Amino acid sequence: MEAGERIDASQLPHRVLETRGHAISILFGFWTSFICDTYIVLAWISKIKGSPDVSASSDEPYARIQQSRRQCHAEEDQSQVPEAG
């Protein structure tokens, strides 16, 4: 095989394809988690900036972030359907 030559997926051993699929799934999970966490933080910041009463309890935002994070991860888990093999 020459440098830069592409390999057809049918030429790869099954184990390589499984590993690649698993790695893509993990990366997708991290990416989804990052997007969810970023959205939660930005929403929280905009709410704080727009709130006239900034002296609210410091525990309350943390609890809301954790609840939103759990909801986001639950939606992520439901969206991942196992592949038929």
From Swiss-Prot:
Keyword Transmembrane helix carried by entry: yes
Domain of life from the UniProt record: Eukaryota
Keywords: Membrane, Transmembrane, Transmembrane helix
GO CC, alphabetical: membrane
Compartments where located: Membrane
Annotated region described as Disordered, given as residue ranges: 51-85
TM stretches of this protein: 21-43
UniProt key word Transmembrane: yes
Recorded topology in the membrane: Single-pass membrane protein
Protein name according to UniProt: Small integral membrane protein 2
Gene: SMIM2
